């Protein structure tokens, strides 16, 4: 008897990717095969994104494609909280579940394609690190779920609930398994990484027989013992974030902080229900760079938020000139169903949003170009992501996968994905570096 086969489509952010990995790990444990072909699958699972309208549209399109190609489709993920919308567009879906409802997804798969009764999990073991959808040399490490903030443009708490921190011992044990499996970079993710442990009052857990506090700084210190790159994402700028800068300066954690500032105008930040301390933030950035000169700062911003005036937008551009951030993403404000910001007065016209977005990107591009040019002539460590006939492509400590730039490496010796090499930088542009391998 052949094993049932599952097709899987994973959309959205790295946190959703980790959810997909968890579901697939359970299905593989039960003997299911995972297939990349729609027509070879007994059932297709689509893990959706529902954060903004464009993501919902992409999710609905992916569901429709899976139905057209296969016909047996189970929907899960963030858009699953809007089951009526999904069924209105695609009434033939077999089941709809929300985010984090892993067991419900597996039960739905059982209902369509039951697992083999003669499957012995002890003879067909899943790798200890579980099924991973990333390349072997890096992995996302989710440390918590949900968020306690109530930003006016966001509906994540209504989809994923309040903050729930994973036990620190479980997180560190998972990290150990990943490193043993060959992972060389751990990307720490959550909805709010710097709030890790606040829901359980930073209670201590145990790892390798010793207590470790459920707190970002202590977690990072423990992860540093594993001897691989540790990169921090989605870090809300609480005061205790200052503590990890010392770990970065000492080489224990990558000197990289992903902090979603969203805007700089105090008036817009208040409307967003975000901290409106942009002047203090500039002072902190200055202190961080004094303590850790190699620090890379990444952030995301929203332009065209309801009520944003030309004065607010110019304030943001001036702030960007002061902050000199290294890596920046920018989005035009898009209404999200259920978000409080939808009720705010003075929406910004689409053509103004587009014009401001273009000006913002041009402004930041000049900053990025100048900052990257200072790295020419320096020697940096590069983790190789891919190799083809044109050469090797990798990332430095300043580059997260898929969202930042990359380093194009010229090497006389053959390279492969996962290699860590020393590179002398020879050229740069707005986002990327070029260099020669020296070791």
Curated annotation (Swiss-Prot):
[4Fe-4S] cluster 2 binds at residues 147, 151, 154. Its cofactor is [4Fe-4S] cluster. CDD domains: Radical_SAM. Residues 133-370 form the Radical SAM core domain. Binds 2 [4Fe-4S] clusters. One cluster is coordinated with 3 cysteines and an exchangeable S-adenosyl-L-methionine. GO terms for molecular function: 4 iron, 4 sulfur cluster binding; aspartic acid methylthiotransferase activity; metal ion binding; protein methylthiotransferase activity. Coiled coil: none annotated. It catalyses: L-aspartate(89)-[ribosomal protein uS12]-hydrogen + (sulfur carrier)-SH + AH2 + 2 S-adenosyl-L-methionine = 3-methylsulfanyl-L-aspartate(89)-[ribosomal protein uS12]-hydrogen + (sulfur carrier)-H + 5'-deoxyadenosine + L-methionine + A + S-adenosyl-L-homocysteine + 2 H(+). GO terms for biological process: tRNA modification. Residues 4-114 form the MTTase N-terminal domain. Pfam families: Radical_SAM, TRAM_2, UPF0004. It comes from the Bacteria. [4Fe-4S] cluster 1 binds at residues 13, 49, 78. The keyword Transferase applies. PROSITE patterns: MTTASE_N, MTTASE_RADICAL, RADICAL_SAM, TRAM. The keyword Membrane does not apply. Keywords: 4Fe-4S, Cytoplasm, Iron, Iron-sulfur, Metal-binding, S-adenosyl-L-methionine, Transferase. Belongs to the methylthiotransferase family. RimO subfamily. Catalyzes the methylthiolation of an aspartic acid residue of ribosomal protein uS12. This is Ribosomal protein uS12 methylthiotransferase RimO. It comes from Bordetella pertussis (strain Tohama I / ATCC BAA-589 / NCTC 13251). The gene is rimO.
């Amino acid at each position: 008897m052949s094993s049932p086969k599952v097709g899987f489509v994973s959309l959205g952010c790295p946190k959703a990717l980790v959810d997909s990995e968890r579901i697939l790990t359970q299905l593989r444990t039960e003997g299911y095969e995972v297939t990349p072909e729609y027509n070879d699958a007994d059932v297709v699972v689509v893990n959706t994104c529902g954060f903004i309208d464009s993501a919902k549209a992409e999710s609905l399109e992916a569901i429709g494609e899976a139905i057209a190609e296969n016909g047996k489709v189970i929907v899960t993920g963030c858009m699953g909280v809007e089951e009526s919308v999904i069924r209105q567009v695609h009434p033939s879906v077999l089941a709809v579940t929300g985010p984090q409802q892993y067991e419900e997804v597996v039960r739905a798969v059982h209902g369509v394609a039951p697992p083999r009764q003669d499957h012995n999990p002890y003879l067909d073991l899943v790798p200890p690190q579980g099924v991973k959808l990333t390349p072997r040399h890096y992995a996302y490490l989710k440390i918590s779920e949900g968020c306690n903030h109530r930003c006016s443009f966001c509906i994540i708490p209504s989809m994923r609930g309040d903050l729930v921190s994973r036990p620190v011992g479980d997180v560190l044990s998972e990290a150990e398994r990943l490193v043993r499996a060959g992972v060389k970079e751990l990307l720490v993710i959550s909805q709010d990484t710097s709030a890790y442990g606040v829901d359980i009052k930073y209670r201590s857990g145990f790892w390798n027989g010793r207590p470790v506090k459920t707190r970002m700084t202590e977690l990072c210190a423990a992860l540093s013992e594993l001897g691989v790159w540790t990169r921090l994402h989605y870090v809300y700028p609480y005061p205790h974030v200052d503590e990890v800068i010392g770990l970065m300066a000492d080489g224990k954690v990558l000197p990289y902080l992903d902090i979603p500032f969203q805007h700089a105008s105090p008036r817009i930040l208040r409307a967003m229900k975000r901290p409106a301390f942009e002047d203090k933030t500039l002072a902190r950035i200055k202190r961080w760079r004094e303590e850790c000169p190699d620090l890379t700062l990444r952030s995301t911003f929203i332009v065209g938020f309801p009520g944003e005036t030309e004065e607010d937008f110019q304030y943001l551009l001036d702030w960007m000139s002061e902050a000199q951030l290294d890596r920046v993403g920018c989005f035009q404000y898009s209404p999200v169903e259920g978000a409080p910001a939808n009720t705010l007065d003075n929406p910004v016209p689409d053509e103004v949003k587009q014009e401001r977005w273009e000006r913002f990107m041009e402004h930041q591009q000049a900053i990025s170009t100048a900052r990257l040019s200072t790295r020419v002539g320096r020697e940096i460590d590069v983790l190789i992501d891919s190799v083809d006939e044109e050469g090797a492509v990798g990332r430095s400590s300043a580059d997260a996968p898929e969202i930042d730039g990359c380093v194009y490496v010229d090497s006389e010796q053959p390279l492969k994905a996962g290699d860590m090499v020393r590179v002398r930088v020879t050229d740069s542009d707005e986002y990327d570096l070029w260099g020669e391998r020296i070791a």
